[in-house]
């Protein structure tokens, strides 16, 4: 859990903003959303495999663009 210490003379709203930013960087909200509902192991594997395929397709598309530029 991210922690933010209030600096001397610092307004509370600035500290809250720093806290929100640190939570976002730590991925707290994304983790909470992911765990909001139970996901069966088969569904989790299926989701991860689909994400891997998508990443691979994106990588191939990026490489093909990189090789076709001849200028």
Swiss-Prot record:
Keywords assigned: Ribonucleoprotein, Ribosomal protein
Parts forming coiled coils: none
InterPro entries assigned to the protein according to its UniProt record, in alphabetical order: Ribosomal_bS21 (IPR001911), Ribosomal_bS21_CS (IPR018278), Ribosomal_bS21_sf (IPR038380)
Any one GO biological process: translation
UniProt GO molecular function: structural constituent of ribosome
Any one of the GO CC terms: ribosome
Family: Belongs to the bacterial ribosomal protein bS21 family.
Cross-referenced PANTHER family: MITOCHONDRIAL 28S RIBOSOMAL PROTEIN S21, SMALL RIBOSOMAL SUBUNIT PROTEIN BS21
Protein's recorded name: Small ribosomal subunit protein bS21
